[in-house]
């Protein structure tokens, strides 16, 4: 739909709304919500653009995912191989009812003549739910897919506890973004998200965060002490 965006959904309606949504993470849900794209040129994927439903909870986490696809084998029979994923993205209040770009740490190489399954993955959480918008209908069965990562689907008793693929007819509002500027902007964000002082330190240090948010932090001593 532009020089950098590859999309299949119908976008929002005249009022700026999608025609539905799908939960990807919440108290009883951890789904991969994906759609299939065929490539007609070699490109580098820098991010996925997705519509965050206003039913989502600010603070919920999601991530962008890319699968390499074997179109001769169904997803359920092993036709998808996880190729890459982004770091976790925390939904903000400003993201609700809006499009957001979720960048990959490094560009993902995609090749002419190959098919890929791209989408958004959520996480089980007792209170923080994440919903992705839907707009339009599939052209064929298997064009859009759901992966129940932990077999949590209460409507599929036979596969309880078993990771399971399904197809659905609603089109995920997930788009490929090949804009090269996403790479540098993500790098800058990672560099300025916090400040550590004093440096050097005697073992006690202060971490000053750039904004109020939920963070996961790991401290490693590279000297092995």
Regions found by a protein language model. Name each.
Residues 39-49, 59:
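Extended extracellular/luminal ectodomain segments enriched in beta-structured repeat modules
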Residues 60-142:
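Aromatic- and Gly/Pro-enriched, solvent-exposed loop/edge beta-strand patches characteristic
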Residues 187-225:
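C-terminal outer-membrane/trafficking sorting elements
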Residues 120-181:
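Short, surface-exposed beta-strand/loop patches at domain edges
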Residues 26-39, 99:
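Short beta-strands within extracellular/lumenal beta-sheet-rich domains
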Residues 2, 178-190:
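Low-complexity, Pro/Thr/Ser/Gly/Ala-rich linker/spacer regions in secreted
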Residues 1-25, 36:
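Short beta-strand elements
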């Amino acid at each position: 739909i532009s020089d950098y965006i590859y999309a299949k959904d119908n976008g929002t309606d005249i009022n700026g709304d999608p025609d539905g949504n799908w939960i990807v993470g919440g108290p009883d849900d951890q789904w991969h919500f994906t759609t299939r794209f065929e490539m007609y040129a070699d490109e580098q994927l820098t991010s996925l653009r997705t519509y965050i439903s206003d039913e989502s909870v600010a603070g919920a986490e999601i991530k962008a995912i890319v699968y390499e696809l074997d179109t001769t084998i169904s997803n359920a029979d092993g036709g998808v191989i996880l190729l890459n994923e982004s770091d976790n993205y925390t939904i903000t209040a400003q993201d609700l009812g809006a499009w957001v770009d979720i960048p990959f740490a490094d560009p993902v190489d995609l090749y002419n003549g190959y098919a890929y399954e791209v989408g958004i993955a959520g996480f089980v959480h007792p209170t923080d739910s994440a919903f992705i918008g839907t707009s339009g209908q599939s052209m064929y069965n298997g064009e859009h897919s759901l992966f129940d990562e932990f077999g949590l689907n209460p409507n599929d008793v036979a596969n309880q506890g078993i990771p399971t693929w399904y197809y659905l007819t609603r089109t995920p509002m997930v788009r490929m973004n090949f804009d090269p500027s996403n790479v540098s902007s993500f790098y800058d964000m990672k560099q300025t998200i916090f400040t550590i002082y004093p440096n050097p330190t005697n073992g006690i240090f202060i971490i000053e965060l750039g904004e109020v948010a939920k963070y996961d932090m790991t401290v490693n001593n590279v000297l092995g002490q």
